[in-house]
Every structure is written in structure tokens, then in C-alpha cells.
Curated annotation (Swiss-Prot):
PROSITE patterns: RNA_POL_BETA (PS01166). It catalyses: RNA(n) + a ribonucleoside 5'-triphosphate = RNA(n+1) + diphosphate. Its EC number is 2.7.7.6. Coiled coil: none annotated. GO terms for biological process: DNA-templated transcription. It comes from Bacillus thuringiensis (strain Al Hakam). GO terms for cellular component: DNA-directed RNA polymerase complex. Residues 1147-1177 are annotated as: Disordered. This is DNA-directed RNA polymerase subunit beta.
Length: 1177
């Protein structure tokens, strides 16, 4: 036997073909959501309140401080919130202190600041009763970026940008004449020396001393019209505020507020970290030749002589001195924006390309501390110095698609930014109220208006592009949605603007973002998925784990380091499949490794790190595809995406050929019931499981509290699939923390089970599997193999109207007793009733305007009190294709104290459940991107059968394999067959699964033929087919594209208001568009009358269609068609352009067109009791 047995959960053993031992457990897969939100509750909120306090009024006399905050208990549980359509939230209370500096009076109060949405245990939010997910956003990190550009004459230049988290941008660029310019906040460009003068370096000499003499600087100084700090300030002010009279004071305060005011300019932690990293002198001196001797100022010791090349060793030696004191200079700017001195660090080096001894100044920003969040003059000088250095080939340009320069904004940060907007709006209100209200009687509660805060949070959860309705089709879809990374959204890219480079796979994605899982279509590459082992660090950069190689011994240790893309660029990393000895020594001398995006073969001494696992490259969904290594990447992409569309089946099976990821994915998805404390199972029911806890007391294990775990039974998911949990433990089982107690939807025995294992043959059959179509045995219908349950929710509300309240009642005008047989006395359908299209669910009547009655009618009304004319029937009926069994009915009444929207008195919800067997037209797929539509369901007896008489279940077209290059399905087929004969389950992990020899070995062990094919007999004739056929077990899933949802036919329905043509689409009960090309086809056939009918009475000849309906009802001949409405619209449009357009007959008389507002059609419609509906488009 090849492979070894591995236990997954309590119930499932698989034979695993993995050769590489896993050093690291997979992390919790939804940690990206939960930990980010936890950070927000613990620190993010506190940061916000610290940033904003104190709020002072304009005189500085009153000051309002936020001291502490606390979250209360939520009003309802998560399940109750879903039922009542409310938000799962907890009240946020803030302790506020108001200080009156004149009187010294201090008032403290607890202020309620709205209900704050809470995250559920599974990483989602319940907003207005619907589960939503906040997707993480990939954005450019705030930092300073340098990039090369080539102008139209082929001359190389550079551009640089300092991008803050919020605030004004600073951009540098060169032009064709070698002048360096700066743009402040996207305005017109100025020579860069103007900015330096404005900072207080007024004379040419000071600037030259700072940056070192070079021709770029002299060109720029020539171009610069200013010659003093004052002139430079005025020049900048004129650019930023054109049209306002410039003064030096105004210019200073403008620059200070633009760049040096922490409230207006914020780099955030990550921006400060990136800028320090980029501009710090130690990173810029690497491999450069010194042009001065470095001396320790304290001892006078020479650390490095002039002309020394600073390699890694030398740099490491002088690093402590660099951090401390070498090259520190204090610049003393005069009269500029900057008050006080500027600390700089400057060292001279030789330019690498110069023949002579051209000296360059390298200016560092003297490593500003982490808590300075705004930009400093030191940063500006260092960034300009870096720019000049680049012109002499010192320094690197940046790649903005590198993951070291893109970071994630997860839930916590997105919420914090939104909360900040709300607080700053509130701050304005507080300031205004401080100056208006009486200072003595004022209280914190009276100052604070919480509306803007609540509004900004509501707006974010309700309508932000990143707050999405959770994809709940199956557990894998849920999990993937929570791990999604989007480059779209506010502050991100747009689909139209995003180029090819942003979407492409980049070498830094390795182990961080999945190169396979991304949507097809306009969003390709903009929406990605987090790799299986990846984590997000405090700065929002994605890290991936590597095993450290001990530099002394060269052994691979068990120690794991998480590296960001930036850090990884400094190391040589070996692949996970390198052969190791027991101790962890590399067995090969030459090793395939990666270094900065290049694959290199290098000596084992040079290796710094090694991959943790082969599946660290791919995401959770991609890691569920067995034999991924044998599939073409385009098809693997489809396979990963289609698994997310699998409909939960009534009785699912986990795959015979799996990858070992099924257990982890199912457990972390949040669909299963997980045990929270170790204990023993005391009771198991369909709806709950009781676990008695084990507690340690004095070293003894004793029984403690009882935990009751409730199951969700037949709940409608967001996508209308059925969400149902079933217990998989028995009474007396001892369970541990984290064990699965109950399967969720699409799970079996604790493993993900999206489809079923079926017997598949690759063969054609009478051409029915042309173009990827699938032929299926009727057994799969009869035995409910692919039967799924779907639940649809319908609601009806009784509102107050101008003419009186609507009423939910059994007494409906013009409806026979037969139609009411399933309604109870309230007029609401009973649970368990079977309903068909058009049946009543909720009887409801709406008052209609009373017309003037004649005397006789009034008399009748007085005698019989006949009410039929005053109300019209607005009952809720079952729509087309919606029939089924009533699963549940919920009634909410205003009188009973239920929270309902304004104007609604009663709300009724009915849930209809359908059991959908598989049928022709349904879409199915394997896990390798092999999808198809069922074209024929054959009786079992007509299916080809194996020599032992077993009919096969599905026939696939063999031509679907070679051109698509997804050979994984063939390997899965053969291995699955062998596993079925052996009665085992198999795990073949991604990139480390069964090799060819393993597959053949298992086939031999199972006693199958040595070509793994078999003779098949035709079920109709009993004759064997000419050739042997590949038959085996394949895992097939039923996708959420079902024919029942797509089939649609229109009778008389709504029309568009302007053109009077039928609407389009199933949702509007619309028609099929008969377009230009279809008209050509009928013209070609000479079918003139058919065509005229289609273009007039079946479409927009308003009078004609009513008359035609009348003629059909009365059995008369259909009248002549009239003028289509769209023709009248065309004429009106031409007339609106000022053209005189008339319709003339052949004898030059004008034809009068009657207007649509003709009562004729409405009268004839009334006679026939037809409702003529018109709808706005």
C-alpha cells in the first residue's frame, strides 16, 4: 500500500499521499475578520477618541474631552435579530468631561453614542436582519514612491510622490531640460528650490550646501525666479490660492496647516514606517563608496575610511553608530515655515557611474519616531535628496504592484475611518453649540449630537461598496467571501481605470494572495483571495510563514517566521518539496530557490528560509481541488470559482478523492456547530445537543455546567438555499474543545461535501453530449442523489393609505371559496399547505377612491351595505415557478409591540419550500473547471453498463479534456474507481499529492485492469462498445444555475411607459426582444404578416393590442394593426428638435394620428375586465 492513514475529525479516515510533513497547522481561516474587529474594539475606538479630544471652542474657554468608552449588551441575540429584521448591535456609551477654564468647573457625564454593530462569532454582521460581510480592501500604502519615466524623445527622467493616508500630495518630477520640479497637492509645478526656500533655506548657497553641487540643482536654481524665503512663500501661496492677495503670514500658516498639522495631514503608523524605511540612511548606503571618512564623534575612532565600499558586513558593523550619531547635522532654517532646527543625517559618497570623483550628498531623515504622524521638514529634505541621488543611479525605483507597497484595510480600519468621519462632523456641531449656548448651564449631553456619528456608521454598513451581502450558497462560499481582498471601493481603483499591470500575478503574491482564485470578467485580478497560511500584520501588510534555516549549521529548523513581501526580498527561499534528512539537512548540494522573483539554482549554504507547505501558495477554495498540479490554470480558476456555486444537496457526500482541506474549511466556515468546552455528550436531538463540561478541580476532572448547542433547522440562507444542521455525535461521546458536533449544509461527517461521488464514463452517446453537455441516468433523479431544497420568502405588508388603512382579511372581493380553502380566519395561508403558481398566500384589500354613486346604487348600498366597490384586491399570490409547501408563516403586528417601518401596521412573511430534483437544463460541474448542462436523462436500463451489470451514472464527452488541459479530472476518475473498490477515502494534497506511480499502484492494489479502462455494454442492445472506456468515480456538483429559475413565459404583462413596449427580463415578467437581426430573418422568409403582428399588436400598438385581445376572446377575426407607439415617440422627438414632421398618405393627404390618451382602449378594456398596466422603465 502506498500513502499513510490520516484521521480527519472523529469520523473520517483518509489515505494520504502527502510526502512532505506539515510543520505548521493552518491558522483559523476567518481570523482576518475577527482579529481586525477585535483590534477596533480594543484600540481603534480609543485612538479615535484620543485624536479628537479635546474639542475646544473658538475662545479656548470650554474644553470637551472623551475619557473612556464601554459597549453594553446587545438587545437581541443574533437569531432574534435575523427574525425581527433588526441590526445586531450593542449600545456605545462614552464618558465625557466638560471643563470650563474660566470658572474651573468640571462636569462629567456618560453619553450614549448610538448602537454599534457587533461582529458575530463567524465574522459577519447582521444589518437589518441580513448577514453582511465587510471585504478587506487592497490599497496603495502611504509612503514615498519613486518611478522612472521616459519622455517622448526617449530621455529618461524620474517622478516621485509622497502619498499620505490623508492630506496633500507632494510630487517631484524632472523635465526635458533637467530641471527638478515640485507639485503641491496637484497644482501647477514649481522648481523644487522654491519649496526649499519656503522651508527657510533662502539663499542658493544654503541649498547647494545641503544637497551637494550638481548640474540638476544648478539648472533648477537658474529656472527659479525667487531669491529669498519671502518671495518663495508668496509664489507658493499664489499657486495654492490663486486670486487671493498673498501675504507672507498667510502663506506660512497655509503651508503649516497643509503639511505639519496632524489633524489635516496624517501618514498613519504604516506611512511613518514606510517613509523611515525608504529614507533611512542605512538602506541607502548599501554597496556605495564613501567620499568621506566616518569618525565616531565621541571617541574619534575611524570607523570607515574614505573610498571604503559599504558591503553588508561593513554596514552591519557601523550600524549602531549610524543609528546614534554619525553624520548628524542640525540645519538652521531662517524665517521660513519651520520654527526651530531641523535634524538631518548626511553622508557623502561617490557616484557609482562617474569616471571622476563626483561626490553626492545622501541625506537621511534622522529616523523620526513612530508617533510623529505628519510629515516633517526632515522628511521633505530627505525625499528631495533621494530624488537627486536617483538621477545619479543611487537608490531604487519602486514597483507599485509589489505587495510591499500595497496594504490591506480590514474591517477594523475601514470602520475606524468611517467613525472618524462621523466624529469630525460631530466636532463641528459641538464647536458651534459651545459658542451659542450659555456657558454656565451647558452640559456634555447638550453639546453632543450623535446623529452624524450614527449616520456615517449606518451609511457604511448599508451602502458602502465593501459591505456586501454575504454569499451563503454553501460553507465554502461563506469562507471565501470573508477572505476576499478587493482593490475596488472608496479610495481604491475603478474597473475602467485599472490597467493590465495591477491585475497581473506578481511574484510577491507567493504565499500571500492566491494566483488562481479570481473572478472571470471585468473584475479579474482586482478581486483576490487570501492564501491559506497568510496573515495580516499590524501595518496591514500580508505576511507568509517560512521555516528558518539556521545560518550556523545550515539545518532547517522548526522555527517559523512570518515575512512581508519587503522582507522576503532580502532572503533566498527554498521550495517546500526539497529533500531533507531527519535532522533537517538539505540532501542536495544545489537547490532550486527563489530570490526577488527569479527562480535560481544555488548552493545550499546560501538558503535563508524554506517554504512551510506546498499549499501555502493557494487559497482555501483552490486547495480543495485534487490534482491541481495537473490542471491548466485557467480551468483551475473556473474549478475554484464553481465550487462556491455548489447548491447544498439533501444528502451530500464528502469526496472519495479529497485533498485533506475539506475538514479545515468546513470547521472554520462557521456553518458547523463547534464544541466550545471539553465534556461528554448527554443528549442528542435533532434541534439541540447537550454537553456536560469537564472541569479541573485540584487536579481531578469533575463534571461541571451543561452547555446546550442549538441547531439551525431549515433556515433560508441569503441565496435561498436551505441552511440545516444535523448532529453527528452520539450520547456518551467524549468531546474536546473545537470538535464538530453537528454538520452544516453541504457537510458530511465534519467534512465539506459540495456534491456526490458518481460513476462517470468518458464516452459519446448519440451526440447528446455535444458541446460539453452531460447525459445522466434516471437513477440520480429517482434516488434523490442531486435533490436540493430551496426556500423562498414572500412578504406582504398592510400600510396606511390616504384613503384609509389596508386590511389583511379572508373577505376578498370576486374570489371564490375554492381559492380561500387554505387560508385561516385571518386570511393567511396555513403552514403545510401545498401551493401552486397564482394561489393566494395572504388576503389583503386596499381601499379605493369612492366614485359618485347614482341614487339607486346609494339605496342598494344602504340596504345591503355592499362593500365590493370600495376596496380592491391587493393580495399576495405565489409568483410563477414559486409553488411548493408552506414551511413557516411569521406575523408581525404593531399592536403586539413589534418594531415595524413607519406607516406599516402588519407584516406577514410566508416561506415556501421546494424540493428540486435534478432535471434537463440544470448546470453541473466537476472540480477541474469541467462544466456542462444536462441534455438528456436516460432510463437506467438504457445506460451503458459495466461487465458486472452496474449501469454508469453520467456520460461526459471525452473531447472536453485534451483542448482544456485539465488532466486532473482523469487522474481523479481512475484513483476514485480504485478507492471505491478498496472501500477507502483518499487525501491527495495540492502540489504534494498522488504521483503517477501512486495512482498506478493503487489501481493495481484494487485489482483493476492495467490500462484502468473497462469494457462497457450498450444498455439498449446488450452489445459491447468497440473500444474500452475510461470509467471511474468523479466528484460532481450541482451548481446554483437551475433551469427552474431561468424558464420564463410571458402572457399579458406590464408595458414601458414611454414606448408602450413590453418590459424585458424574468423579474419584470417581460417579453423576449425581437431585435434587428430577428427582423431580417423574418424578412428573408417573406413572412410579412407575422412580422407586422410582432412589431405592432404583440408590442406597442396600444389600441390594436386591446382590440386583438377582444377579438380573440369573442372569437372574431383579428383587426388590422394600427400605428406603433414608438413611431409616435420618434415623430415627437423629431418635432422637439424643431423639425416639422407629418405622416402623409399616398395621395398626399396628411394622416391624423390619434394620441395614446384615447379612452377607447381603456373603455374596451373595462368591458372585458382587462387591466391595462403601464410601468415606468
Amino acid at each position: 500500500m502506498t500513502g499513510q492513514l490520516v484521521q480527519y475529525g472523529r469520523h473520517r479516515q483518509r489515505r494520504s499521499y502527502a510526502r512532505i510533513s506539515e510543520v505548521l497547522e493552518l491558522p483559523n481561516l476567518i481570523e482576518i475578520q475577527t482579529s481586525s474587529y477585535q483590534w477596533f474594539l480594543d484600540e481603534g475606538l480609543r485612538e479615535m477618541f484620543q485624536d479628537i479630544s479635546p474639542i475646544e471652542d473658538f475662545t479656548g474657554n470650554l474644553s470637551l474631552e472623551f475619557i473612556d468608552y464601554s459597549l453594553g449588551e446587545p438587545k437581541y441575540s443574533v437569531d432574534e435579530c435575523k427574525e425581527r429584521d433588526v441590526t445586531y448591535a450593542a449600545p456605545l456609551r462614552v464618558k465625557v468631561r466638560l471643563i470650563n477654564k474660566e470658572t474651573g468647573e468640571v462636569k462629567e457625564q456618560d453619553v450614549f453614542m448610538g448602537d454599534f454593530p457587533l461582529m458575530t462569532e463567524t465574522g459577519t454582521f447582521v444589518i437589518n436582519g441580513a448577514e453582511r460581510v465587510i471585504v478587506s480592501q487592497l490599497v496603495r500604502s502611504p509612503s514615498v514612491y519613486y518611478s522612472g519615466k521616459v519622455d517622448k524623445n526617449g530621455k529618461r527622467g524620474f517622478t516621485a510622490t509622497v502619498i499620505p493616508n490623508r492630506g496633500a500630495w507632494l510630487e517631484y518630477e524632472t523635465d526635458a531640460k533637467d530641471v527638478v520640479y515640485v507639485r503641491i497637492d496637484r497644482t501647477r509645478k514649481l522648481p523644487v528650490t522654491v519649496l526649499l526656500r519656503a522651508l527657510g533655506f533662502g539663499s542658493d548657497q544654503e541649498i547647494t550646501e545641503l544637497l551637494g553641487d550638481n548640474e540638476y540643482l544648478s539648472n533648477t536654481l537658474e529656472k527659479d525666479n525667487t531669491d529669498s524665503t519671502e518671495k518663495a512663500l508668496l509664489e507658493i501661496y499664489e499657486r495654492l490660492r490663486p486670486g487671493e492677495p498673498p501675504t507672507v503670514e498667510n502663506a506660512k500658516s497655509l503651508l503649516v496647516s497643509r503639511f505639519f498639522d496632524p489633524k489635516r495631514y496624517d501618514l498613519a503608523n504604516v506611512g511613518r514606517y514606510k517613509i523611515n524605511k525608504k529614507l533611512h540612511i542605512k538602506n541607502r548606503l548599501f554597496n556605495q563608496r564613501l567620499a568621506e571618512t566616518l569618525v565616531d564623534p565621541e571617541t574619534g575612532e575611524i570607523l570607515a575610511a574614505e573610498g571604503t565600499i559599504l558591503d553588508r558586513r561593513t554596514l552591519d558593523r557601523i550600524l549602531p553608530y549610524l543609528e546614534k550619531n554619525i553624520g548628524f547635522k542640525t540645519a538652521k532654517p531662517m524665517g521660513g515655515v519651520v520654527e526651530g532646527d531641523v535634524e538631518l543625517q548626511s553622508i557623502k559618497i561617490y557616484a557609482p557611474e562617474s569616471e571622476g570623483e563626483r561626490v553626492i550628498n545622501v541625506i537621511g531623515n534622522a529616523n523620526i519616531t513612530r508617533d510623529v504622524k505628519h510629515i516633517t521638514p526632515g522628511d521633505i529634505l530627505a525625499s528631495i535628496s533621494y530624488f537627486f541621488n536617483l538621477l545619479y543611479k543611487v537608490g531604487d525605483t519602486d514597483d507599485i504592484d509589489h505587495l510591499g507597497n500595497r496594504r490591506l484595510r480590514s474591517v477594523g480600519e475601514l470602520l475606524q475611518n468611517q467613525f472618524r468621519i462621523g466624529l469630525s462632523r460631530m466636532e463641528r456641531v459641538v464647536r458651534e453649540r459651545m459658542s451659542i449656548q450659555d456657558t454656565n448651564a451647558i452640559t456634555p449631553q447638550a453639546l453632543i449630537n450623535i446623529r452624524p456619528v450614527i449616520a456615517s456608521i449606518k451609511e457604511f454598513f448599508g451602502s458602502s461598496q465593501l459591505s456586501q451581502f454575504m454569499d451563503q450558497t454553501n460553507p465554502l462560499a461563506e469562507l471565501t467571501h470573508k477572505r476576499r481582498l478587493s482593490a475596488l471601493g472608496p479610495g481604491g481603483l475603478t474597473r475602467e481605470r485599472a490597467g493590465f499591470e495591477v491585475r497581473d500575478v506578481h511574484y510577491s503574491h507567493y504565499g500571500r494572495m492566491c494566483p488562481i482564485e479570481t473572478p472571470e470578467g471585468p473584475n479579474i485580478g482586482l478581486i483576490n483571495s487570501l492564501s491559506s497560511f497568510a496573515k495580516v500584520n499590524e501595518f496591514g501588510f500580508i505576511e507568509t510563514p517560512y521555516r528558518r534555516v539556521d545560518p550556523e549549521t545550515g539545518l532547517v529548523t522548526g522555527h517559523v517566521d512570518y515575512l512581508t513581501a519587503d522582507e522576503e526580498d532580502n532572503y533566498v527561499v527554498a521550495q517546500a518539496n526539497m529533500k531533507l534528512s531527519e535532522e533537517g539537512e538539505f540532501l542536495d548540494e544545489d537547490i532550486v530557490a527563489r530570490f526577488r522573483g527569479e527562480n535560481i539554482v544555488t548552493n545550499k549554504e546560501r538558503i535563508d528560509y524554506m517554504d512551510v507547505s506546498p499549499k501555502q501558495v493557494v487559497s482555501a477554495a483552490t486547495a480543495c481541488i485534487p490534482f491541481l498540479e495537473n490542471d491548466d490554470s485557467n480551468r483551475a480558476l473556473m474549478g475554484a470559482n464553481m465550487q462556491r456555486q455548489a447548491v447544498p444537496l439533501m444528502n451530500p457526500e464528502s469526496p472519495i478523492v479529497g485533498t485533506g482541506m475539506e475538514y479545515v474549511s468546513a470547521k472554520d466556515s462557521g456553518a458547523a456547530v463547534i464544541c466550545k468546552h471539553p465534556g461528554i455528550v448527554e443528549r442528542v436531538e435533532a434541534r439541540e445537543v447537550w454537553v456536560r463540561r469537564y472541569v479541573e478541580v485540584d487536579g481531578q476532572t469533575v463534571k461541571g455546567d451543561l452547555d446546550r448547542y442549538k441547531m439551525q433547522k431549515f433556515i433560508r440562507s441569503n441565496q435561498g438555499t436551505c441552511y440545516n444542521q444535523r448532529p453527528i455525535v452520539s450520547v456518551g461521546n467524549e468531546v474536546v474543545k473545537g470538535e464538530i458536533l453537528a454538520d452544516g449544509p453541504s457537510m458530511e461527517l465534519g467534512e465539506l461535501a459540495l456534491g456526490r461521488n458518481v460513476l462517470v464514463g468518458f464516452m459519446t452517446w448519440d451526440g447528446y453530449n455535444y458541446e460539453d453537455a452531460i447525459i445522466m441516468s434516471e437513477r440520480l433523479v429517482k434516488d434523490d442523489v442531486y435533490t436540493s431544497i430551496h426556500i423562498e420568502e414572500y412578504e406582504s405588508e398592510a400600510r396606511d393609505t390616504k384613503l384609509g388603512p389596508e386590511e389583511i382579511t379572508r373577505d376578498i372581493p370576486n374570489v371564490g371559496e375554492d381559492a380561500l380553502r387554505n387560508l385561516d380566519e385571518r386570511g393567511i395561508i396555513r403552514v403545510g399547505a401545498e401551493v401552486k403558481d397564482g394561489d393566494l398566500l395572504v388576503g389583503k384589500v386596499t381601499p379605493k377612491g369612492v366614485t359618485e354613486l347614482t341614487a339607486e346604487e346609494r339605496l342598494l348600498h344602504a340596504i345591503f351595505g355592499e362593500k365590493a366597490r370600495e376596496v380592491r384586491d391587493t393580495s399576495l399570490r405565489v409568483p410563477h415557478g414559486g409553488g411548493g409547501i408552506i414551511l413557516d408563516v411569521k406575523v408581525f403586528n404593531r399592536e403586539d409591540g413589534d418594531e415595524l417601518p413607519p406607516g406599516v401596521n402588519q407584516l406577514v412573511r410566508a416561506y415556501i419550500v421546494q424540493k428540486r430534483k435534478i432535471s434537463e437544463g440544470d448546470k453541473m460541474a466537476g472540480r477541474h473547471g469541467n462544466k456542462g448542462v444536462i441534455s438528456r436523462i436516460l432510463p437506467e436500463e438504457d445506460m451503458p453498463y459495466l461487465p458486472d451489470g452496474t449501469p454508469i451514472d453520467i456520460m461526459l464527452n471525452p473531447l472536453g479534456v485534451p483542448s482544456r488541459m485539465n488532466i486532473g479530472q482523469v487522474l481523479e476518475l481512475h484513483l476514485g474507481m480504485a478507492a471505491r473498490y478498496l472501500g477507502i477515502h483518499i487525501a491527495t494534497p495540492v502540489f504534494d499529492g498522488a504521483r503517477e506511480e501512486d495512482v498506478w499502484g493503487t489501481i493495481e492494489e484494487a485489482g483493476m485492469a492495467n490500462d484502468a479502462k473497462t469494457i462497457l455494454y450498450d444498455g439498449r442492445t446488450g452489445e459491447p462498445f468497440d473500444n474500452r472506456v475510461s470509467v471511474g468515480v468523479m466528484y460532481m456538483i450541482k451548481l446554483a444555475h437551475m433551469v427552474d429559475d431561468k424558464l420564463h413565459a410571458r402572457s399579458t404583462g406590464p408595458y414601458s411607459l414611454v414606448t408602450q413596449q413590453p418590459l424585458g427580463g424574468k423579474a419584470q415578467f417581460g417579453g423576449q426582444r425581437f431585435g434587428e437581426m430577428e427582423v431580417w430573418a423574418l424578412e428573408a422568409y417573406g413572412a410579412a404578416y407575422t412580422l407586422q403582428e410582432i412589431l405592432t399588436v404583440k408590442s406597442d400598438d396600444v389600441v390594436g393590442r386591446v382590440k386583438t385581445y377582444e377579438a380573440i376572446v369573442k372569437g372574431e377575426n383579428v383587426p388590422e394593426p394600427g400605428v406603433p407607439e414608438s413611431f409616435k415617440v420618434l415623430i415627437k422627438e423629431l418635432q422637439s428638435l424643431g423639425m416639422d414632421v407629418k405622416m402623409m398618405s399616398s395621395d398626399d393627404t396628411e394622416i391624423e394620428m390619434r394620441d395614446t390618451e384615447d379612452d377607447d382602449d381603456h373603455q374596451s378594456a373595462d368591458k372585458l375586465n382587462v387591466e391595462v398596466e403601464t410601468t415606468k422603465e
